[in-house]
UniProtKB/Swiss-Prot annotation:
Protein S19 forms a complex with S13 that binds strongly to the 16S ribosomal RNA. Gene3D superfamilies: 30s Ribosomal Protein S19, Chain A. NCBIfam families: rpsS_bact. Keywords: Ribonucleoprotein, Ribosomal protein, RNA-binding, rRNA-binding. HAMAP family: Ribosomal_uS19. InterPro entries: Ribosomal_uS19, Ribosomal_uS19_bac-type, Ribosomal_uS19_CS, Ribosomal_uS19_SF. This is Small ribosomal subunit protein uS19. GO terms for biological process: ribosomal small subunit assembly; translation. GO terms for molecular function: rRNA binding; structural constituent of ribosome. The gene is rpsS. Belongs to the universal ribosomal protein uS19 family. GO terms for cellular component: cytoplasm; small ribosomal subunit. Pfam families: Ribosomal_S19.
């Protein structure tokens, strides 16, 4: 079930402070965050946010089409290495 419209989007306070500080200063440095649950807001457009995936911070450049999504959607936590091919020739020998 989606979040109620009367509540508004959830953004962690520390992340919102960093974004507004960079907007006022006019800088676009990478903002590191562990807050994967925060929603992308229009004031984040043009910033690069380092979203933690459990191991490292994945740089995510925020565009207009990302508004309304959560930051965690853009930093996958699992790496799929692929299924190992079954080598039947080696087994026969």
């Amino acid at each position: 079930m989606p979040r109620s419209l009367k509540k508004g989007p959830f953004v962690d306070e520390h992340l919102a402070k960093k974004v507004t500080a960079q907007n006022e200063a006019g800088t676009h440095n990478v903002i590191k965050t562990w807050s994967r649950r925060s929603m992308v807001t229009p004031d984040m457009i043009g910033h690069t946010i380092g979203v933690h995936d459990g191991r490292k911070h994945v740089p995510v450049f925020v565009t207009e089409s990302m508004v309304g999504h959560k930051l965690g959607e853009f930093a996958p936590t699992r790496t799929f290495k692929g299924h190992v091919k079954d080598d039947k020739k080696a087994r026969r020998r």
